[in-house]
Amino acid sequence: AQIGREMVLHTSHRYNWVQLAGAVNHPEKGKRIDLSSDNDKLADIDDSSVILYPTDGYGNPDLLKGIIEVEKPDAIFLITDPRYFQWVFQMENQIRKNIPIAYLNIWDSMPAPMYNKEFYESCDALFGISKQTKSINEIVLGDKADSKVIKYVPHGLNNKIFRPLDKTNEELQKFKKHLSRGKDCDFMLLFNSRNIRRKSISDTILAWKLFLDELTPEKREKCTLVLHTEPISDHGTDLGAVIEYFFPENDGNVVISADKFTTEQMNMMYNCADGVILISSAEGWGLALTESLLTGTPFIANVTGGMQDQMRFEDEDGNWINFDKDIPSNHRGTYTKHGKWVLPTFPTNLSLVGSPVTPYIYDDRCSFEDAALRIQEMYEMGDKERCERGKAGMEWALSDEAGFTSEKMSNRIIEGLDELFNTWVPREKFEFLKDTDYQSRVLKHKIIY
């Protein structure tokens, strides 16, 4: 939702938008809501057109057909997991005769998902949020990639909201006291994400314990791990029970923050932290790292998915790495030189897991022992070095190379859509297929790299 909002806001000077606004049970389902005047104020323009069609779930074919008939869009733009839009892809032979389909997509981990082939083939433009995803689109499509617009469009956030603050600011100091539950804190490490299994929160807690066990009681007392997440989740675990088990006399060393914060408060939270930690497995992007970068906060992260983009690993020529079928990911540590703002942990285990709809994907987990060493390294840096490293990360995130801001992300979207409109050829009304045309869904890249 955050990315979609920023994209619409920063492209509404160029395109009119009609959005299927989904929710589990949307209270305004069936309405047509005009947000143009509100968007004009936020975007500082006077001619935008932003229309919402609230709906339950992700929409349905009848609703989309009605919107196409009434609003007459020039393209359809999709964002999210392809399985939520199977019903759109099943209509592609009707839609693409008249208008193209663009898809801002991401895939969390290797191997390249050949089971997504039909989804990718149903699109005219594929904007990969991570470098790994762009490579996956090309690997899965094979020769058919030549007929698509395929671009790298990393996530970007509003750098007027997520920005460094004066650490001596009285309001910020009060907020830090709130986060630490009134405790004096010399070192605060922040986790900010959902309580789901692949976020490895329990491993983070265990790494924190190993780190604290090496400190004197006096130093330990002034260290706090803030977990900004749900305390209990069926998709994750009971964090209170985990904390009680490893910290039976918890004196504020681990704090769960379940408050709902405004974006300004979220920015303050990152500015309170000395570092951010996110050691997820199979992480598509990791917005917590983007927020960390824009606030000038160094981070500890697992080398996986889109998180490795935000670490700026370099190849042999000093260039920001790209991926292909020979080196489809850096989670094996092929490249080790990275930006100074990150302390990476490399996966120590790549386990092939899956489900009926996603038969194979790597669960690439780092060890909590490695994470503990990275925490200790960040702690021993001291405030000055952490600030210098965080500043370097912020400057890179704002640069044209990275461009992890709303404006630069939106400019990349505009470039991609303009290319699509200039090159798009409508789908043939019909095509002949032979029963021998089926291609087996087989491995197309190296396993060891």
What are these regions (language model features)?
Residues 298-301, 311-312, 318-325, 343:
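Short hydrophobic beta-strand element within catalytic cores of glycosyltransferases
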Residues 336-449:
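C-terminal amphipathic helix plus adjacent low-complexity
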Residues 23, 132, 156:
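Carbohydrate-associated surface elements
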Residues 1-36, 71, 447-449:
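N-terminal subdomain of nucleotide-sugar transferases
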Residues 236-264:
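Nucleotide-activated donor-binding/catalytic signature segment of Leloir-type glycosyltransferases, i.e.
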Residues 281:
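Aromatic "clamp/platform" in nucleotide-sugar-dependent glycosyltransferases that forms part
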Residues 34-125, 131-132:
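Extended catalytic core of nucleotide-activated donor transferases of GT-like folds
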Residues 181-199, 205-208, 225-226:
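Conserved donor-binding/catalytic core segment of Leloir-type glycosyltransferases
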